[in-house]
A protein has these predicted regions:
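Short glycine-dipeptide loop
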Residues: 67-68, 142-148
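Class I S-adenosyl-L-methionine
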Residues: 155-217
Length: 217
């Protein structure tokens, strides 16, 4: 880790705030913003957090869903245990994950997943889109009616097509970039609310650039 990176991180107000408040990552502020703006969580909400490590989003969801809420965090990497948080070790694309989740349904499905960065932006963008498609495929199976889906994606020419794939299944779909996202970052979030379980499903396309996703998730 270079000195320049360390200095930039220390100068980051969201990083400092996360350290001060004992949060697991600065990404927690992104989800807090999205909930404040779009009212994702209600008391007692059932939340599925995909690509959850180190757990920053899961803890925000746990706090906002309240003591009667349920949060299931999914990641192949370890997540520190927290009272009320159920951790499932697994990968989103693994068919066994659906079996491990059982028959439960969720009010909110979150995905802050990122691909392994190759350094070729077109490839990284396409892989991020494919991760959203994997998360969406699972969300369509487990979301309760009127539920919400939130997913990170890297900006690029495939995002419009991705939004068109999401839109038939939800009453509202928007794109946004939280203030806590770093200015140079290409990340944005697709926020979909009002899940329609009976909407017809399209066959999932595969981006040629993402033929080998090589994801961390």
């Amino acid at each position: 880790m270079g000195r320049r990176f360390v200095d930039q991180r220390r100068a980051d107000p969201y990083y400092r705030a996360a350290q001060r408040e004992g949060l697991r990552s600065r990404a927690a502020f992104k989800l807090a913003y999205l909930d404040d703006r779009f009212h994702l969580f209600r008391p007692g909400a059932r939340v599925l957090d995909l690509g959850a490590a180190p757990g920053g989003w899961s803890l925000i969801a746990l706090d906002r869903a309240g003591p009667t809420g349920t949060v299931v965090a999914v990641d192949p990497r370890p997540i520190a245990p927290t009272e009320g948080l159920r951790v499932v070790r697994g990968r989103v694309g693994d068919p066994a994950l659906r079996e491990r989740l059982g028959s439960r349904s969720f009010d909110v499905v979150l995905s802050d997943m990122s691909p392994s960065i190759s350094g070729a932006y077109a490839t990284d963008h396409a892989r991020s889109v494919d991760l959203v498609r994997s998360a969406l495929e699972l969300a369509l199976r487990v979301l309760a009616p009127r539920g919400a889906f939130v997913a990170k994606v890297f900006a690029g020419d495939l995002v419009d097509e991705l939004v068109l794939e999401v839109r038939p299944h939800f009453a509202e779909v928007v794109r946004t970039k939280p203030p806590a996202s770093r200015a140079p970052s290409s990340e944005l979030y697709v926020v979909a609310r009002g899940f329609r379980p009976n909407a017809p499903r399209r066959e999932r396309p595969v981006s040629p650039e993402a033929a080998r996703p090589d994801s961390d998730i």
